[in-house]
């Protein structure tokens, strides 16, 4: 493949892509002769070049750090993973930062539960490994001109005609298809997933899950007027927000949404208080630390 385009300062950017690149490091200097030879192989003809100001090479770089956290050292973005130029993983550096930021803030504020920072590696390393697999698949689809490679590409063209498949692949590329493992038995199917952007009807007007997340705070979203769940969560205020709302397509009675928009816990439709309340308090404890101290009737402080 040969590509070129105009640069803002008036120059031209040219590049070639070959299915069988030389076994050289990206740091190995490229000579003008090498580039002209590559153009000849790709185009089948010589292309006269004027003054060349910069030459570089890049290959299929798909790699990931073994650990995203080692004590006080934390890796994110390109320091944690590198993906080839296929579009997959374009959001992953931002998602690393969003996952890590609220956990660091919790540690600094002093309410982080034990092991909270370790979940950054557990969750984002898993997500990065999936992205690496996807980039390798995309590169495999782009390479090769033999009948087997063409058949594979044709199969994917047919699959992409299906809207559901297209949405799934779009979520893979965006990085929102990840389901993080959540602590506790019998978790709802939504637990660990990226919160759906529901349209919400509240006493203050119409809003959405995405708008609620602008504050980057944990939210207990009560979708079924569950006073028992709201009362159970009050011991964690003002650390978390509690929002009651109605929606046309209710996926659960309530959602506990982390600041990174992943669901920490969900109450099944009609789930009794006997199981929902202790499960909610367990999730709040696991992700947002001990409940705030409350004062008993004698004036002594106790934990809620």
Locate predicted features.
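Glycine-rich phosphate/pyrophosphate-binding beta-alpha loops
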Residues: 81-91, 144
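Short FAD-binding loop at a beta-strand-to-alpha-helix junction that anchors the flavin cofactor
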Residues: 69-84
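A short, flexible beta-alpha/helix-coil linker loop
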Residues: 19-23, 80-82, 137-138, 262-263
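Functional cores that coordinate and move charged inorganic groups
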Residues: 91-104
């Amino acid at each position: 493949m040969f590509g070129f385009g105009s640069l803002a300062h008036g120059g031209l950017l040219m590049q070639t892509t070959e299915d069988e690149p030389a076994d050289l490091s990206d740091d190995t200097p490229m000579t003008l002769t090498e580039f002209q030879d590559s153009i000849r192989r790709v185009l089948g003809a010589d292309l006269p070049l004027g003054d060349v100001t910069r030459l570089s090479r890049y290959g299929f770089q798909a790699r990931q750090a073994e650990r995203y956290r080692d004590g006080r050292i934390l890796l994110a973005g390109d320091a944690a993973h590198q993906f080839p130029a296929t579009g997959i993983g374009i959001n992953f550096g931002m998602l690393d930062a969003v996952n890590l930021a609220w956990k660091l803030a919790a540690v600094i504020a002093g309410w982080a539960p034990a092991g909270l920072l370790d979940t950054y590696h557990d969750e984002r390393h898993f997500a990065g490994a999936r992205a690496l697999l996807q980039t390798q698949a995309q590169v495999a689809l782009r390479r090769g001109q033999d009948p087997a490679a063409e058949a594979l590409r044709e199969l994917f063209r047919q699959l992409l005609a299906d809207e559901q498949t297209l949405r799934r692949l779009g979520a893979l590329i965006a990085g929102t298809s990840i389901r993080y493992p959540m602590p506790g038995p019998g978790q709802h199917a939504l637990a660990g997933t990226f919160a759906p952007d529901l349209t919400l009807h509240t006493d203050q007007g119409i809003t959405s899950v995405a708008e609620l997340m602008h504050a980057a705070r944990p939210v207990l979203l009560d979708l079924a007027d569950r006073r028992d769940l709201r009362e159970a969560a009050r011991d964690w205020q003002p650390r978390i927000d509690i929002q009651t709302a109605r929606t046309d397509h209710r996926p659960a009675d309530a959602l506990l949404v982390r600041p990174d928009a992943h669901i920490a816990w969900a109450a099944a439709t009609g789930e009794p208080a006997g199981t929902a309340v202790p499960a909610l308090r367990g999730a709040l404890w696991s992700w947002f630390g001990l409940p705030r101290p409350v004062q008993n009737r004698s004036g002594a402080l106790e934990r809620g």
